[in-house]
Amino acid sequence: GRYANARGSEPTWTPRAMRSLAEAEPSVFWLDDRSAPPALPSLVGAVEADLVVVGGGYTGLWTALHAKEADPDRDVTLVEAATVGWAASGRNGGFCASSLTHGEANGLDRFPDEFDTLERLGRENLDGIEATITKHGIDAEFERTGELDIAVEDWQVDELNEFARLLAEHGTDPVLLDREQTQALVHSPTYLASRYDADGVALVHPAKLAWGLRQACLDLGVRIYEHTEVTKITSDGAGLALRCPFGSIRGRQVALATNAFTNLLRRLGNYIVPVYDYVLVTEPLSPEQQDAVGWEGRQGLADLGNQFHYYRLTADNRILWGGYD
């Protein structure tokens, strides 16, 4: 798409690349959706709650939801500095994986003694996510399609085989597909082999999942304030006091669910490393384009590279692909 000039200075975009991006829009695909709910009011004045949840991403929403389900009489309040799902929960590829260790290979390397337990808990967690979506009637475009982990280089085929051997030692029966079997599922000449995890990955619309959890919380009586940043937390007798721009909250308990936005507890700063994720999304594929690609199973795909290496179909048959650094 671009080339460096003779002096090695900043690359120049080619005319073809410029044409292909002429109508592209640099926005968050999932959040730019006509089904986005209207913003909720900000907190103005002083309120009290049994539990205050700070952060309106998945962690905060599920914390509030489970707390209210466990004790309907508990007064639960959630505050979000922007809007629900605005940050990482609405800015990802929409792969919902059972792995708690960011991939089984990482789990085997770092937690060999606990790996089997972590895998079991991860499967139970994914089942629980699906159960919550079903219970509350959340339209999150949830598809439990599984995932193909794909080798596109010869050395990656060897890596897949070794990985399968390690999984087998832990009681897993990995499904390995050769070149012909893999290309029969997705028609790419670059695919040399794959491992198919049929049940450990689901695809979702990340923002719709967050918005659905928001509505489930509201239906149960959770108070949610958007555009309400917590600027300070101090002890207040048997509870905690939270300061906001136009109000305050006194909570008996506080759950911080702010991910990288942890300046309220500065001692956590050394444990946070930002990860930048990028995605590109095509226009909806035509029927002819869909036939050319195959991909009838709509599996999530991830090749064994380390940049733009994951891709999937959206509900309206766009191809989304992305990666992180």
What function would you assign to each model-found segment?
Residues G1-L51, E69-A70, R74-D75:
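Extreme N-terminal leader/targeting segments of oxidoreductases
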Residues A17-P26, L31-D33, H102-L108, A131-G212:
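Flavin (FAD/FMN) cofactor-binding and adjacent substrate-gating region
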Residues G55-T59, A81:
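Glycine-rich Rossmann-fold phosphate-binding loop(s) that bind the pyrophosphate
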Residues K68-R91:
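Glycine-rich FAD pyrophosphate-binding loop
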Residues R91-R120:
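Glycine-rich active-site loop/strand segments that organize a redox cofactor
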Residues G94-C96, D127, K135-E143, V230, ...:
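Active-site substrate-recognition segment that forms the wall
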Residues D113, T117-A131, E162:
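A non-catalytic, amphipathic alpha-helix used as a structural packing/dimerization or gating element
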Residues D158, R165-A168, S194-R252:
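Helical element adjacent to the flavin cofactor pocket in flavoenzyme catalytic cores
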